[in-house]
From Swiss-Prot:
Gene Ontology CC entries for this record: chloroplast stroma
GO molecular function: carbonate dehydratase activity; zinc ion binding
Family: Belongs to the beta-class carbonic anhydrase family.
Residue ranges of the region described as Disordered: 1-26
Lineage, highest ranks first: Eukaryota, Viridiplantae, Streptophyta, Embryophyta, Tracheophyta
Species assigned in the record: Pisum sativum (Garden pea)
Name this protein carries in UniProt: Carbonic anhydrase, chloroplastic
Composition skew (Low complexity), residue ranges: 1-15
SS bond partners: none
Length: 328
């Protein structure tokens, strides 16, 4: 058996201990394992520590403010103001100025039917209008082709963090990247029941869109990785979903703790942000259609790391080799 280590992975090729003079049939055999410490390697893929379900806390009871109550408060406020002005007539000029200011302010935040305008809705509207004018209308050929279908060369796993949109960081154009974003840019191992959403995305990208590259991109100051290193994972939970999700990165945490246990927490986070990318690359190998693409050399796996503090980007590849096993 020969083993090579690439970016924290041992890619092993198995061959028989003895040769045979009998007729043999060659078939490819691939083995990959993720190192969880500096001194030893595991022959199994990363697995979750706990298989017990996590029950969400009860939904909060929300009591809406009734219009009648709102009206009553308004009437009381007006009555109090009128009473104050009757008692202190010298305040009328000041009150008139204040009322004028309030009227002007309400005029900019309310529509004609009295419903408050949403700044978020306005931002979405103006954003789309800018996109339509500056990009969509100026690229009729591109969007005409995209109307017929998509054939992106990249599938990208990136973090949901609002600061690290891969389309902006890597200047992807529409139709270039099939993107999956989640907390800490994690790829879970193959599990048809538990991670069907991720599995469906990978299956669609590889088998139907025929992407030629899958790229997992980590980033600096990742809150998900900070949580991975901070949560005790002792059976108690302070979140409904986050702790269970970031458990996917536990092999990366174990390796970083073993190799850099005495480092400051911020440094541990940086190491783990990168090692979690390698763990996800290892998990991608548990998907049969990904392995098939690697065997056929129609697919490549890459890891990336974006440091938005320094303005730098690292890229590395997961090298994949084959040997042949013998069946008599």
């Amino acid at each position: 058996m020969s083993t090579s280590s690439i970016n924290g992975f041992s890619l092993s090729s198995l061959s028989p201990a003895k040769t045979s003079t009998k007729r043999t049939t060659l078939r490819p055999f691939v083995s990959a394992s993720l190192n969880t410490s500096s001194s030893s390697s595991s022959s199994t893929f990363p697995s979750l520590i706990q298989d017990k379900p996590v029950f969400a806390s009860s939904s909060p009871i929300i009591t809406p403010v009734l219009r009648e109550e709102m009206g009553k408060g308004y009437d009381e406020a007006i009555e109090e103001l009128q009473k104050l002005l009757r008692e202190k007539t010298e305040l009328k000029a000041t009150a008139a100025e204040k009322v004028e200011q309030i009227t002007a302010q309400l005029g900019t935040t309310s529509s004609s039917d009295g419903i408050p305008k949403s700044e978020a809705s306005e931002r979405i509207k103006t954003g789309f209008l800018h996109f339509k004018k500056e990009k969509y209308d100026k690229n009729p050929a591109l969007y005409g082709e995209l109307a017929k279908g998509q054939s992106p060369p990249f599938m990208v796993f990136a973090c949901s963090d609002s600061r690290v949109c891969p389309s902006h960081v890597l200047d992807f154009q529409p139709g270039e990247a099939f993107v999956v974003r989640n907390v800490a840019n994690l790829v879970p191992p193959y599990d048809q029941a538990k991670y069907a959403g991720t599995g469906a995305a990978i299956e669609y990208a590889v088998l139907h869109l025929k992407v030629s590259n899958i790229v997992v991109i980590g980033h600096s100051a990742c809150g998900g990785i900070k949580g991975l290193l901070s949560f005790p994972f002792d059976g108690t939970y302070s979140t409904d979903f986050i702790e269970e999700w970031v458990k996917i990165g536990l092999p990366a945490k174990a390796k970083v703790k073993a190799q850099h246990g005495d480092a400051p927490f911020a440094e541990l986070c940086t190491h783990c942000e990168k090692e979690a990318v390698n763990a996800s690359l290892g998990n991608l190998l548990t998907y049969p259609f990904v392995r098939e693409g690697l065997v056929n050399k129609t697919l490549a796996l890459k890891g990336g790391y974006y440091d938005f503090v320094k303005g730098s980007f690292e890229l590395w590849g997961l090298e994949f080799g084959l040997s042949s096993t013998f069946s008599v």
